[in-house]
UniProtKB/Swiss-Prot annotation:
GO cellular component: nucleolus; nucleus
Protein's name in the database: ATP-dependent RNA helicase DBP8
SS bonds (residue pairs): none
Region (Disordered): 1-39, 291-331, 495-531
Domain Helicase ATP-binding, chain residue ranges per copy: 69-247
Ranges of biased composition (kind: Low complexity): 1-28
Biased segments, Basic and acidic residues type: 291-314
Domain Helicase C-terminal: 332-531
Catalytic activity: ATP + H2O = ADP + phosphate + H(+)
Function statement: ATP-binding RNA helicase involved in 40S ribosomal subunit biogenesis and is required for the normal formation of 18S rRNAs through pre-rRNA processing at A0, A1 and A2 sites. Required for vegetative growth.
Amino acid sequence: MPQVAASSSNVGPSSAAASSASHVQEVAKSASDPPKHTSFSSIGISPMLIRSLASLQIKVPTPIQSLTIPSVLEGRDLVGGAQTGSGKTLCFALPILNKLIKDMVGGFAVVLTPTRELGVQLHEQFVAVGEGARMGLRCALVLGGMDMMKQASELANLRPHVIVATPGRLVDHLRSGGGEEWGLRRCKFLVLDEADRLLTDTFKPELEYLYSVLPSAKTLQTLLFTATLTEQVVEFANAKRPEGKPAPMVCKIEMDTKTPETLEQRYVFVPSHVREPYLYHILRHPPIKPSSERVRKLNAKHQADRERKEENQRKSGKRRRTHHASDSDLDQDDDAALFLPATIIFTARCKTAATLSGMLAELGIPNVSLHSHLRQSERSENLQTFRAQRVPVLIATDVGSRGLDIPDVELVINWDLPSAWQDYVHRVGRTARNGKRGFAISFITERDIDVIHSIEDKINTKLTQLEGLEDEDKILEKLNAVATAKRVATMALHDSQFGERQQRNQHKQLARLKAEKRASKKAKSAGHDQQ
């Protein structure tokens, strides 16, 4: 079971993952033990918010919520460590809204996130709880990749209580002078979600600027949430505090090395050059059936789509046919592709995700992808499409999907095996939640044998071979069709100049860093000359 631990700083240095061990061990306990707080009312949450939570089917606090919320309500700075799906968003959203009810001032809280997708998700959760409480919450979403002029107008007119933002875009607005109208002078809370990613050199200039315009640390309550206690997070916990301000609480739910009991874990051991036909076969003949609720929704949607298509065909006076790569070589019932279980396929690289997405689309399997080479609007649309069950398959990188809570996943496929066992647990943990049945399949090649053995040792579970793949000749009958689809997808990527925008941005960032380094050296040299 997960381990619950809490301590005040100091947090030790060295190994970040175990950095607080010597200080939290004496109060550590199993999450299966009766929690100190078993209801939201017992931790001081307003009845208005409790009613809102109930309408969202949230009845009792999770272990990390029970552990952190009382300290936040007491006014303590806090470092909270928990995995995706543990309910950590409410660890800061509920205390912020609880205090905001008593003092509805603009610029009350700033919530920073490293990714736009996570920002959208955080904003949705604030709005959902706030609307349910009927408290008149004004929450703004300030992300890069969106119309800055429109954002500036909304900020000025809305005067939001809570701002959910990526650091770069928020700094852009503040530097442009817009912050004078909706500024952060009265800000009470600063939240860094996915703090291990925010407290890196990538975001350092933006964070330093934000610290300079926010109220002093003496009055500002700072909350960090992370899955990993990195060195930078530890430095924050150990940093010198203003006189009279206590050290931050460090609360952590230790990651469980066990996978859910309702999760079936299998492997497919095939040479790398024939993996694609096996993937296609598995998706066409999945080892787990979609839930009855999913089938009901898909049936309704499918019937509506068919009626609309037939109506269009009657109007045009002819029948339309969708062409896929080598249709004669493929299973003819393309309608069945819509009735797949909700599936996430994890890849190691953006290009792999894009190639698989194009290939499967050519083969008649509806899907969307989620990776950093997509534009913000594309990522948001793709994520919403999968969440709304309009397509059955999401192809994602770890970075592209990190921090996102994607419910009701029934099948996880590791196309590329992660090198770290923690990543494996995190991936497969997206299915088999809340006692539901789930299935995880890992593709393994000759190079992955040591890695899979290491993962099995850590999770104390032996993966078994996936059944139903004995007829290799039948599976490889689709080899030509699948190869054609992959070739079409690869050519489409090449024609779209895939990845060139990211390369240009990297070159610009490198040039900026070099310029800053030269300026710093020049300033130091001038200082020495004056001495």
